[in-house]
C-alpha cells in the first residue's frame, strides 16, 4: 500500500492492481486533514514521507506528518505555490510574490534560484517538477494576485513552460499554450506531462538528453491544476475531483 496526496489536505489511500480497472482499495475513503486555510496549494512529499503544503495568500508553508499532525513550517515563503523536493532533500518552490523560483535550506531560509528570462521577470511561476538529473521544469502562466504590487504586470510575451538545467541554463520549451499549469514527469526522466488548463488538455512529451522536448502527443481531455504519478505510471489529474489515467491515456478511476 502507498498513499497518494490529492487536492491539498484531502487524503486517500490507494492500492496497486496492475492494469485492472479501478485502483482504489475497497475500504479506502477520502478524509479531510485540516481546515481554516485561505487557499491551499502545492503539496510535496519529503524524503521522510511528510507532506508539505502552502497556504498561499497567507504566505505560509505547513507540514503534515505521519502522526496526522499539521504544523507551521515557514511564514516567509515568497507566496509559494507549487513545490517539489530535490534529490538532496531541499524544498524548491514557485514563489510568485516576486515571480521567482526559490529553495529552502535546512534552516528554512529561502534563497533565490531564478527570476528572469531574457531580461524580463517571469509572469508568475505556478508548478514545477524536478527530473532525476536535477533539471527543473516549471510552468509560468499568469494569474493576477491581489497581493501583487500595482506595477506587477505580465512581462513575458507568452505563458510558457521552462527548462532550468542543473548548471543554470534556462530555456523556454513550450510556447503554444493558453495557460500552462500542472506538470509532472516520469521517475526515469524520459517523459513529461503538462496541463493547458484553459484549453482543457493534457499533453505528453519525450524529454531529449539536452532537456528539450519532442513528440508532443495529446494525452487526456482535461485541464489540471496539479498532477502526480504513481509507481505504475498512472497520472493523477486534479480540478474539482481527481481523475486517474493509465500511462496509455485511459481513464481508469475518478475520486471525489
Language-model-detected regions and their locations in the chain:
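Hydrophobic h-region of N-terminal signal peptides that target proteins for export
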Residues: 10-18
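Sequence-structural signature of mature extracellular/luminal beta-sheet repeat domains
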Residues: 18-256
Amino acid at each position: 500500500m502507498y498513499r497518494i496526496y490529492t487536492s491539498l489536505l484531502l487524503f486517500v489511500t490507494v492500492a496497486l492492481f496492475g492494469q485492472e480497472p479501478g485502483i482504489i482499495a475497497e475500504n479506502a475513503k477520502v478524509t479531510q486533514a485540516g481546515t481554516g486555510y485561505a487557499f491551499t496549494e502545492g503539496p510535496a512529499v519529503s524524503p521522510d514521507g511528510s507532506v508539505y503544503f502552502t497556504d498561499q495568500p497567507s504566505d505560509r508553508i505547513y507540514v503534515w506528518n505521519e502522526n496526522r499532525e499539521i504544523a507551521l513550517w515557514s511564514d516567509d515563503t515568497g507566496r509559494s505555490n507549487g513545490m517539489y523536493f530535490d534529490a538532496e532533500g531541499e524544498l524548491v518552490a514557485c514563489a510568485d510574490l516576486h515571480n521567482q523560483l526559490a529553495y529552502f535550506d535546512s534552516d528554512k531560509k529561502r534563497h533565490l534560484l531564478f527570476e528572469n528570462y531574457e531580461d524580463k521577470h517571469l509572469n508568475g511561476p505556478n508548478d514545477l517538477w524536478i527530473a532525476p538529473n536535477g533539471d527543473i521544469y516549471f510552468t509560468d502562466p499568469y494569474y493576477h494576485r491581489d497581493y501583487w504590487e500595482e506595477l506587477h504586470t505580465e512581462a513575458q510575451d507568452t505563458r510558457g513552460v521552462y527548462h532550468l538545467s542543473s548548471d543554470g541554463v534556462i530555456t523556454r520549451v513550450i510556447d503554444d499554450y493558453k495557460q500552462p499549469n500542472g506538470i509532472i514527469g516520469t521517475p526515469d526522466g524520459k517523459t513529461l506531462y503538462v496541463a493547458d488548463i484553459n484549453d482543457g488538455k493534457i499533453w505528453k512529451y519525450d524529454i531529449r538528453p539536452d532537456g528539450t522536448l519532442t513528440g508532443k502527443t495529446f494525452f487526456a481531455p482535461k485541464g489540471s491544476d496539479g498532477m502526480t504519478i504513481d509507481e505504475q505510471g498512472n497520472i493523477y489529474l486534479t480540478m474539482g475531483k481527481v481523475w486517474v489515467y493509465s500511462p496509455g491515456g485511459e481513464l481508469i478511476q475518478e475520486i471525489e
